[in-house]
Every structure is written in C-alpha cells, then in structure tokens.
Amino acid sequence: MTFRGDTAVVVLAAGAGTRMRSDIPKVLHTLAGRSMLSHSLHAMAKLAPQHLVVVLGHCHERISPLVDELAESLGRTINVTLQDRPLGTGDAVRCGLSALPADYSGIVVVTAGDTPLLDAETLADLIETHSATSSAVTVLTTTLSDPHGYGRILRTQDNAVMAIVEQTDATPSQREIREVNAGVYAFEITALQSALSRLSSDNAQQELYLPDVIAILRRDGQTVSARHIDDSALVAGVNDRVQLAQLGAELNRRIVAAHQMAGVTVIDPATTWIDVDVAIGRDTVIQPGTQLLGHTQIGDRCEIGPDTTLTDVTVGDNASVVRTHGSSSSIGAAAAVGPFTFLRPGTVLGTGGKLGAFVETKNSTIGAGTKVPHLTYVGDADIGDDSNIGAGSVFVNYDGMTKNRATIGSHVRSGAGTRFVAPVNVGDGAYTGAGTVIRDDVPPGALAVSGGPQRNIEDWVQQKRPGTPSAEAARKASAEQSTPPPDADQTP
C-alpha cells in the first residue's frame, strides 16, 4: 500500500502515561505480542510514507533503541525526535516537523503511539479524503456512546467542521456531543506550520493543543474536512490498564476471527489467545485454553490444545500438541506432544516423533519416529531416528560446572529408569537394561547393564523397624507362609 511520495507521518509518543501506574513507558505496554508503539509503526510503515517520525519525551532513552530495532526489522528509516518539555500535542507536532527536510511540502499525517488497533486501511482512507477535498486539514472522527475524555467535534449548521473542544474546556452542552476527535489528522504542511505558530496555551491544561489548529485554519478561510469511521475501536486510545485489557481483548477477537475466516477451527474463541505474528494452517483445530504467542507457526491439519501455550514454536503439518507448554522449539510433521509436556528452548522433535506425559526437553534434537513416552528429562541430547527412551529416564547433563551432551543413536531401546551421564555416546541399535546408569560409551548393538546382583537382607524390617505397620505386616505374611496348608484328603 503506497501513496504519492510527498507523504510524511508523525507519531506522537512523548506522553508520560501516568494513569498506567507503571515503570514501563506507556507505549511499550504490549498486546497481541507487540508494544502499542510497534502496532502503530507497523501500520504506518504499510503506507510507505516518504518520512516516518516518532516524537519521544518521557523515558525516551528506553524507547529510542527499540524504535531503531523496529526500523531495522521493517527495513525502513524511522527518525526519532525529542520533545524536551511536555508543552502539549501542538508543541509535540512542531518537534516532529523539525525532523522533516526544510523543503518538504507535502501531506503530514499525525497520529498517536497509543492507538494499537489503527490500521493502514483507515489511514489510507483519511489521506484519500484529504486529497480529494483539497483540504488544509482532514480530521478522523468517530461516534462514542460514552465520549468522556475525548475532544468533541463542533460543526456548523451546514455540518462543516468548525472546531474541536477538549473535555476539560467544553461547556455542558458541548459535552453532550458524541462525535469525537480520534486524534488522527492529515495536514498540508504549510497550513499546519502557520497554525502551529499561532497556538495559545490559554486553556485549562495550559498546553498547546493540536486540535486548536482546526479553529485557526477555519478562521483563515481554509478548507477543514472530516472522515468519520463507524468502527470506533480502530481509534481507541489506551490511558490505563483497564483500557489496555479491553483493547487487547478486542484485538484478540479480531485476530481469532481472521484465522477462522482463513480456515482454522477455533473451538472457544473466548479462551483462545493468538498474537498478531502467529501463522496457522488450514483445517487446524485450536482447542479451548490455548495461547499461541510470538512468532509461532502452525502447519495444516494440526490439533493444538486444550490448555496449551506455545511461544515461538514451529509445528509441522498433521501434528498434535496437547496440554503442553513450549517455547523456541520445533515440532515435526505428524508428531505427537503431550499431555503435560514442557518444551524448553532448543527442542527439535523430528517427523512422527512423540514426547508424552510429563516429559521435559531442552536444547535437544529428537529424531524422526523416536518416542519419549513418559516421565523423562531430555537435556542437551541428540537422539537418532526410531529410538525409544524408557519411562523415568534422565539425561544427566550437568556436572556442577558445565552442561555436557549425550548422543543416542538410531533404533536404540533404553530400559525404564536409565540414567545417561553425559558426556556419553550410545551406538545405533543398542539396548540398556532397566535402571542402568550409563557412564561409558555403549557400542552399537550392545546391551548395557549396571549394578551387581540383587541382595535381600532377611527380617531387616522386623529388626530395624519393630512395632511399625510394615513390621507387623511382614510378621503376619511370614507366619502365613510358614503354616502348612491342610491336607485335603485327610479324614477326621
């Protein structure tokens, strides 16, 4: 989506956000996997404007490096400018204009960094309206059932935009108006610069209000237009954590619906949370209580959930992931994971593999067709194809100072309760006996067993634990075993 080259966007993100009651700058609070500022800049970047400027103030030293990272990921330049003192939105825009070339003469779009649902399509409509009407300014408006806190749109009898009055400066009758300023504008730069130079701080907040530019341009005889949108959530701002949660839920509803329309079955949208950068293939079923976060990628025809959280996890086609918590891992096609499986970063499960109940994996590669069915820890290991790791096995990877790797070949069968003390190698086709502690390499095809013959110490419980329920049970059992059974053929 592109427009004529002479379009610049200024994003206002200098506010302190005191109502958030947070040590985190307001625009860095997240929803659907992105900060509010990131949502805004992603939308602005889709317009491909000639210039993109972010105005920072409060906590600029924390926000500016993140803007630079985002600019790199978006593959475009984003200029940052600083508002030294909080003198109002009018002053913030003036700071933003200072980052533009002196000879810039095109359209300036002004928006805020705390409207995370604002999309590129809405901005495109605003710019098209602005260009079609040859206006000095076009303001985006919407109608709210409860407009408290928003600037009201004042219109003339012929319905032209006359001015914008802030909540704190509005009369009782003006506060009854439900059409509000969405805080998004398209300006001709020369008209904007002229009006900014005449702003006054003679108001309740003693600040330079950007909306006052509307009345100034109107008095100058300039054309002032408005673009009304019915979907007010697109321009809803965030000032506190209640609004953050409300917009987060609304954004999630839209994300889930988009996946449903693309061929994904979501059994219970109310308990399903999907980040904006998640991709899900067709005919996949998402069960209740599932969170798909970060850059998680799900293939076609998968079954995910219930009660599953995946963060930056790749899942191949036809895989099943049930009651699993996983991050920074890869699950192969037709693999089965869960229930109650913990995938820590660096886990790679091959095609058709299985990680079952109460299995934890970390920094390990598990080959195609290999099964780790239950009650096992696999850390810092490389396991070949079509092997089976018995229940209760542990990869002992830490020696108190360093993590060591274990390598298990293909077609290996390990008995229940095997301990692989790394570093160690087990060759292809080898077997291990139940309870074996593997401290040395096992050759291909060998059976590894450890420990001496079992030794039973008779009557130990009665001697060492006399009077206990165990001792009494043992006494009775011994007595029963020592009593000969009656002779069935004996006659009285």
From Swiss-Prot:
Give me the ranges of the annotated region Pyrophosphorylase: 1-241
Q: What is its main location?
A: cytoplasm
Q: Name one GO biological process term.
A: cell morphogenesis
Q: Where does this protein hold UDP-N-acetyl-alpha-D-glucosamine?
A: 12-15, 26, 83, 88-89, 151, 166, 181, 239, 344, 362, 377, 388
Residues bound to acetyl-CoA: 391, 397-398, 434
Q: Which CDD domains match?
A: GT2_GlmU_N_bac (cd02540), LbH_GlmU_C (cd03353)
- A molecular function (GO) term: UDP-N-acetylglucosamine diphosphorylase activity
Principal EC category: transferase
Q: What is its EC number?
A: 2.7.7.23, 2.3.1.157
Give the UniProt subcellular location, in the record's own words.
Cytoplasm
What assembly does the database describe for this protein? Homotrimer.
Q: Which HAMAP family match?
A: GlmU
Q: Quote the PANTHER family the UniProt record gives.
A: BIFUNCTIONAL PROTEIN GLMU, NUCLEOTIDYL TRANSFERASE
Q: What is the official name of this protein in its record? A: Bifunctional protein GlmU
Provenance organism: Mycobacterium marinum (strain ATCC BAA-535 / M)
